[in-house]
Amino acid sequence: MLAQLPRQALSRLSVLPLYGGGFWVAFTQLTVFYYAVGAVLHFVLPRIAPVKPIQHQARKRGEVLRDAFYSLGPLAVKAAIWTIVEHMHSRGLGLTYGGKVYGLAAVSYCSLCVALLDYLHDAWFYWTHRLLHWGPLYRHVHYIHHKYDTTLPPHLPPTRCHLSSRSPSAFTGYSFHLVEAAIVFANEILVCFMFPLHMGLHRCYHLYTTLIHEGGHVGYELAPFIPTLEGLMTLVLRGVRHRAPWLNTVQHHDLHHRYPTRHFSLYFTHWDRLCGTIHPSYDKDLFSYFSSSS
């Protein structure tokens, strides 16, 4: 029966284009990926995998649903930014390129691009994250992401961020203000002017960062680092038993939700260490956690 369908109908049944499909294709990609990954991380893995919680507070009823709902706005902002990148590419603005990627040289270059994107994304996230903790931006914008955290920065009055115990979940990843979304995702446009970047890699990489933001809030560790290319190479070279102190963990960001003036980075710890925003007990607590888990 499927063979009898006209070719046009079959094309409609095909997978969405990776890029070039406009806003609604981008938004569909993001929402399906975000909520599917969130469901697996929040509902499935804790039940089938030997995970050890790092949070000691129960989530209040409705918090997960609230975060899932609040994520829709930032997902739309990210889809709009992807659409801008598509229009830039079609008009020859920036350094993006298309076509097939084959051969050792092309694959090696794409791997180098991933490493560059990791370091640029981490730097952008660290400094914009610190900016979002500046008093006015925190009170009017970033407070949504920390809305029910147990601790507030000492220089801020507990006004709109009313103290109420909670632990973040996977769906907290993109649960933030639309202005924050525009700030956080702006680097996805900026990187298009920094070095030649394949459009397919741009889309896949920034779709993958969605998983990173969700995974940083799940409340348990599955690996001794946030999954990155650098983390994979470290695992190959050092083995699973040797934790790399320069790589971030879920606990790294979880501590930020308990101590909001600490831990602003995403993939790596070097900015926090250089700028004095690493928590004093982080390394010791992390060593104890993984020692007791082994």
Q: Which positions does each model-derived feature cover?
A:
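Conserved hydrophobic/aromatic pocket- or pore-lining residues that grip, position, or stack substrates
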Residues: A68, H129, H142, H146
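Hydrophobic alpha-helical transmembrane segments of multi-pass integral membrane proteins
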Residues: T28-V40, L72-H89, L116, I183-L190
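Juxtamembrane helix-loop-helix connectors linking adjacent transmembrane helices
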Residues: A80-H121
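Cytosolic/stromal cytosol-facing helical appendages immediately following the last transmembrane segment
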Residues: M1-T28, V37, F43, R47-K60, ...
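Hydrophobic alpha-helical segments of membrane proteins, primarily the transmembrane helices
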Residues: V25-V32, V64, L112, L116, ...
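Interfacial transmembrane-helix boundary/kink motif in multi-pass membrane proteins
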Residues: G21, Q55-L75, G98-C110
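Hydrophobic transmembrane-helix microenvironments that flank and shape a buried ionizable site
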Residues: S71, D118-D122, Y126, Y174-H177, ...
